Amino acid sequence: MKVEFAPLNIQLARRLQTVAVLQWVLKYLLLGPMSIGITVMLIIHNYLFLYIPYLMWLYFDWHTPERGGRRSSWIKNWTLWKHFKDYFPIHLIKTQDLDPSHNYIFGFHPHGIMAVGAFGNFSVNYSDFKDLFPGFTSYLHVLPLWFWCPVFREYVMSVGLVSVSKKSVSYMVSKEGGGNISVIVLGGAKESLDAHPGKFTLFIRQRKGFVKIALTHGASLVPVVSFGENELFKQTDNPEGSWIRTVQNKLQKIMGFALPLFHARGVFQYNFGLMTYRKAIHTVVGRPIPVRQTLNPTQEQIEELHQTYMEELRKLFEEHKGKYGIPEHETLVLK
């Protein structure tokens, strides 16, 4: 296979964009395990003066990710994130105004390999979110295990991430006076195993917890489709029933997160590596589904609202797919 190298005379702006995405990918993949490893080494080598104060801090701070987190405007405003956004580039599209006196749950689809569009649009401060949705604060919910990693948890909270636990989502959408948007990548880790270019498979039919929370607190539901998310990486073929998929499913059940076998490009060549491809991401925010507060929703009410959500999600995809290069015959597969 002939290796296609990146040209040497690339503009500085593009080099900065590459650096911004590279650091994000490396942090996404390595910072959590590294922080655990460093903590273990400190304990093994008896650096009490370092790890004892931090473990005490963890004890008192353990539930912060379920109470809105601890974001840092300074970190969220790093110029680094502008270069990150411009690399793809990432776009946010609004289809309807939202009322800032209410709280909302955004269902983000698809997960892709790393949910790049969710992070770029709803976590750091260089998307058009503040202009499109004035009066709102967005909170991107991620797996609770992200907050089990010492030090790493402080970093992910600083960029606005919070836990996706029931307690955390309920806390955000029960805010008096509204103005909160909880962004949940509903397909989760399981959906990343179906993140193949040109495919639109969403794991949603069994995801009903967000519907119950919406009913309990009267939070409106909003489907969000991120076109281009599945084009950022290539993944090893892993159809249902294959030995690769069987192993991946078992590991996902054991560990709580998936291990897709993916690749894209490198820093200095375009053939192989863990850098994402330069593919545009268009994240389209759909119409809100009004939800009447029901403190003790029945299963029938949950099923009805869940069905309405899936119908609105499908409509959103069909209405906008042509604008972003999706063939007319392609449709969503809801699992």
UniProtKB/Swiss-Prot annotation:
Q: Which residues cross the membrane?
A: 18-38, 40-60, 132-152
Its tissue distribution reads: Expressed in stomach and liver.
Q: How does it sit in the membrane?
A: Multi-pass membrane protein
| Swiss-Prot/TrEMBL keywords | Acyltransferase, Endoplasmic reticulum, Glycerol metabolism, Glycoprotein, Lipid biosynthesis, Lipid metabolism, Membrane, Transferase, Transmembrane, Transmembrane helix
Where does it localize?
A: Endoplasmic reticulum membrane
Q: Signal among the record's keywords?
A: no
GO cellular-component terms in the record?
endoplasmic reticulum membrane
Q: Which GO terms describe its biological process?
A: diacylglycerol biosynthetic process; glycerol metabolic process; triglyceride biosynthetic process
Mind telling me which InterPro entries this protein's record contains?
DAGAT (IPR007130)
Q: Which residues are glycosylated?
A: N121, N125, N180
Pathways involved? Glycerolipid metabolism; triacylglycerol biosynthesis
PANTHER family reported in the protein's UniProt record: 2-ACYLGLYCEROL O-ACYLTRANSFERASE 1, DIACYLGLYCEROL O-ACYLTRANSFERASE
Name of the featured protein: 2-acylglycerol O-acyltransferase 1
- The species is Homo sapiens (Human)
Task: Please state the gene responsible for encoding this protein.
Answer: MOGAT1
